[in-house]
Each structure stands twice: as C-alpha cells, then as structure tokens.
Design a protein with these regions (language model features):
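Conserved redox-active cysteine motifs that mediate thiol-disulfide chemistry
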Residues: 64, 72-89
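A short beta-strand-turn-helix
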Residues: 47-68, 91
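Structural microenvironment flanking redox-active thiols in thiol-disulfide oxidoreductases
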Residues: 81-120, 130-137
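Conserved hydrophobic/aromatic "anchor" residues
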Residues: 48, 63, 72-73, 116, ...
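Hydrophobic beta-strand anchors of alpha/beta hydrolase catalytic cores
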Residues: 69-70, 101
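N-terminal targeting signals for export/organelle localization
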Residues: 1-44, 171, 178
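Thiol/disulfide oxidoreductase modules built on the thioredoxin-like
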Residues: 115-123, 128-176
Length: 178
C-alpha cells in the first residue's frame, strides 16, 4: 500500500513538473518572440528610408503608384550574384513602364557593395540596411528574398530564393501599373 502511494506521488510530481516546464516555456517563448509580425500577401509594405551608394535617400512610400521589386541580398550570396545581372536587364526593360527595383543589401560596407555593383554593371538603386532594421521589419530569411509590391503599396508576392530571368520578367509584368 505504501508503495502504491509512493508511485502515485511520483507520477503526480512528474505531471506537475512537466506542466510547470510547459508553462514556463510558453511564457518565455511569448516574451522573447520577435516583435515584428510576419508579413504576407495583401499586407501593406512597411515604409522605410535607406540611403543608396550615391548618398541619395530612398523612401519606399515615394514609389507609390509604381510597382516595386524589393530585393534583399548580400554580396557573399551566390544565388544573389546569379540573379543580379538578370534583374538589371529586366530593370532596363521595365523602368520606363512604372516598375522600379530597390535592392536592399544587408549590412555590408559601401566598399563591398560598390565593388559588387561595378563588377556586375548594375544600374538599379542599391541601398544598404546597415542596422538590419528593414530586414527585421520584413522578417527576411533566407537571402535572396524578393517582395513584389503593387502600385497601391501592398505586397503581391514573396519569393524566397533565386529567380531566373524569366521569373523576374514575369514578376515585373505582374506589378506593372495598368
């Protein structure tokens, strides 16, 4: 009989311990959760202002009325390097049709980014997110990640990973103003 009571006590203690750990984990997880909401298709793209390689400010809301091909990338990222020349070629096709590229480099030096842009002969605006605040606001992971923003400023599509030139042309057509 004493053994049965001891077993019940042990089982109850084990259950209470598991519940306590689950509660503590839930509280900790909620307290440390990312303060930014996950963005999705149909959401308004959060506004930001970043500076390009020429020192010129680019504010996302200034592009309202145009389609924006918002690309997050790094010079060390092989898929980014592969898609950049195709993005530049499509930029030449679509820039006069109301579609703009805004390429957001993630926290690298101006020197590294300028060298990369010169190496690939890129003509579209490249801005640097030195504090990673824009990357965090958009919950960017992995690189490259591209958001297609329609002329109304809403996210139309989120593309994670490398794109082909055919994909890029199709996506730019998709956000081209009527």
């Amino acid at each position: 009989m004493a053994q049965t009571k001891q077993k019940r006590f042990l089982i109850r203690t084990l259950i209470l311990t598991v519940l306590a750990v689950a509660i503590i984990y839930t509280i900790y997880n909620n307290a440390t959760k990312d303060k930014f909401e996950v963005l999705g298709v149909g959401d308004e793209a959060p506004d930001f202002t970043l500076v390009d390689l020429n020192g010129e400010e680019h504010r996302l809301s200034d592009y309202k009325g145009q389609g924006v091909f918002l690309n997050f990338w790094g010079t060390w990222c092989k898929p980014c390097a592969k898609e950049m020349p195709a993005m530049d070629r499509q930029y030449e096709v679509f820039k006069d049709q109301g579609v703009q590229i805004l390429a957001v480099n993630i926290a690298q030096s101006n020197f590294e980014v300028e060298r990369f842009a010169d190496q690939y002969g890129l003509d579209f605006p490249i801005v640097i997110d030195k504090t990673k605040s824009v990357m965090e606001a958009y919950n960017i992971d992995p690189l490259p990640t591209t958001l297609l923003i329609n002329p109304e400023g809403e996210i139309e599509k989120i593309v994670r990973g490398e794109m082909t030139e055919q994909d890029i042309a199709l996506f730019m057509e998709q956000i081209r103003p009527e």
